[in-house]
């Protein structure tokens, strides 16, 4: 299986070009074709010699993804189901925000973090995505926008789709450098947010990368007992270890950290827990922000439901009274398979049902012949 050329940073592409006996400027030409002209084949790179096009076609593909399903919400949110070269499925979401167009990308096929409320973890991690497969999600969404001829551009990225981004660290870092490159897509680093469930050592490493992207931490509980019961990762990196890493990140980068907090009815949404959360973040109040997230129910996790508006507002009020910077996050795509991983999970179910039906039909046909 040929890798995608999107897997290369510009520096990597220059290295490959030189190693293959070509002039350095060819890398710049290829880069501009990929990210400025956004061509989908090497044959469209009309200022390259035929011999170089043949080399590229021999070693790489451009976009490795196939579009399987597109769902569009009434609010303009678009969810894509893409098929990878090995047949695995991933999701990508385009959201219309007041500040621009934001894309949520997936970094792994499945997830091993084991959050008990999440659709992403219904299927264990199969593999990491390559950097090229992550970049390709942005490129296909941008292609979709280009074809609408409304002069729309992906302006923001959230690395919050299926999987744990910091568990696929090297590929995610390459992805960030590709989309941030000012000679390519030129998406500003401060318009990019990487989320983590709390891999403390990787947070420390990320702090020292020198990138200006934003960090979000999926917290979802204010104490170890509760967090360990709903997020398996907390048993490995408990809250005190996680917060030591977060404080180190803030000290090194002087950048704000966002905490994601899904509101689960009568699980983590009490006013006592709001006070615990306020106390937990007290030492980093000036450089932290809390997103309260309405829960998108998942049929396989029917023990959970969305917090009521009353409980959410009471929780929010406690945080505000403690001087916490917080907001109740705007919802997107509530009339489609909104929860992360839900479209993929539902599609896999339907595919299995169709396969069983085909097998049953074949058996019935064989029985008739017999």
UniProtKB/Swiss-Prot annotation:
GO molecular function: 4 iron, 4 sulfur cluster binding; metal ion binding; rRNA (adenine(2503)-C2-)-methyltransferase activity; rRNA binding; tRNA (adenine(37)-C2)-methyltransferase activity; tRNA binding
Catalytic residue positions: 91 (proton acceptor), 340 (s-methylcysteine intermediate)
Catalytic activity: adenosine(2503) in 23S rRNA + 2 reduced [2Fe-2S]-[ferredoxin] + 2 S-adenosyl-L-methionine = 2-methyladenosine(2503) in 23S rRNA + 5'-deoxyadenosine + L-methionine + 2 oxidized [2Fe-2S]-[ferredoxin] + S-adenosyl-L-homocysteine; adenosine(37) in tRNA + 2 reduced [2Fe-2S]-[ferredoxin] + 2 S-adenosyl-L-methionine = 2-methyladenosine(37) in tRNA + 5'-deoxyadenosine + L-methionine + 2 oxidized [2Fe-2S]-[ferredoxin] + S-adenosyl-L-homocysteine
Known EC number: 2.1.1.192
GO biological process, one term: rRNA base methylation
Alphabetical UniProt keywords: 4Fe-4S, Cytoplasm, Disulfide bond, Iron, Iron-sulfur, Metal-binding, Methyltransferase, rRNA processing, S-adenosyl-L-methionine, Transferase, tRNA processing
Cofactor requirement: [4Fe-4S] cluster
PROSITE patterns in the cross-refs: RADICAL_SAM
SUPFAM superfamilies cross-referenced by the UniProt entry: Radical SAM enzymes (SSF102114)
EC class: transferase
Co-factor binding comment: Binds 1 [4Fe-4S] cluster. The cluster is coordinated with 3 cysteines and an exchangeable S-adenosyl-L-methionine.
Pfam families linked: Radical_SAM, RlmN_N
Note: Reaction proceeds by a ping-pong mechanism involving intermediate methylation of a conserved cysteine residue.
Record-stated family: Belongs to the radical SAM superfamily. RlmN family.
Function: Specifically methylates position 2 of adenine 2503 in 23S rRNA and position 2 of adenine 37 in tRNAs.
NCBIfam families hit by this protein: rRNA_mod_RlmN
Protein name, entry field: Probable dual-specificity RNA methyltransferase RlmN
Organism: Streptococcus suis (strain 98HAH33)
The gene coding this protein: rlmN
């Amino acid at each position: 299986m040929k890798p995608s050329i999107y897997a290369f940073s510009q520096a990597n592409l220059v290295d490959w070009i030189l190693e293959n006996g070509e002039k350095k400027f060819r890398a710049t030409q290829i880069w501009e074709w990929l990210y400025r002209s956004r061509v989908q084949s090497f044959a469209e790179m009309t200022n390259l010699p035929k011999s170089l096009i043949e080399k590229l076609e021999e070693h790489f593909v451009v976009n490795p993804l196939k579009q399987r399903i597109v769902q569009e919400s009434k609010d303009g949110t678009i969810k894509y189901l893409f098929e990878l070269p090995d047949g695995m499925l991933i999701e990508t979401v385009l959201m219309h925000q007041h500040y621009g167009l934001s894309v949520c990308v997936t970094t792994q096929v499945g997830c091993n973090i084991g959050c008990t409320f999440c659709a992403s973890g219904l299927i264990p991690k199969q593999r990491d995505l390559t950097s090229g497969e992550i970049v390709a999600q942005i490129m296909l969404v941008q292609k979709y926008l280009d074809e609408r001829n409304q002069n729309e551009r992906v302006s923001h990225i959230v690395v919050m789709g299926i999987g744990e981004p910091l568990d696929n660290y090297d590929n995610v870092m390459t992805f960030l450098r590709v989309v941030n490159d000012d000679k390519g897509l030129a998406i500003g680093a401060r318009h990019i947010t990487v989320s983590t469930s709390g891999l403390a050592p990787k947070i420390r490493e990320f702090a020292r990368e020198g990138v200006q992207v934003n960090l979000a931490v999926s917290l979802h509980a204010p104490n170890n007992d509760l967090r360990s019961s709903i997020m398996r990762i907390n048993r490995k990196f408990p809250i005190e270890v996680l917060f030591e890493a977060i404080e180190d990140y803030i000290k090194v980068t002087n950048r704000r950290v966002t905490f994601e907090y899904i509101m689960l009815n009568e699980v983590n949404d009490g006013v006592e827990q709001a006070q615990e959360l306020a106390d937990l973040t007290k030492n980093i109040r000036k450089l932290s922000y809390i997103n309260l997230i309405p829960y998108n129910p998942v049929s396989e996790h029917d023990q959970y439901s969305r917090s009521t508006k009353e409980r959410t507002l009471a929780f929010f009020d406690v945080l505000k009274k403690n001087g916490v910077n917080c907001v109740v996050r705007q919802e997107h795509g509530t009339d489609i398979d909104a929860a992360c991983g839900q479209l993929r999970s539902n599609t896999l179910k339907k595919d299995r049902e169709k396969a069983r039906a085909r097998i049953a039909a074949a058996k019935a046909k064989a029985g008739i012949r017999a």
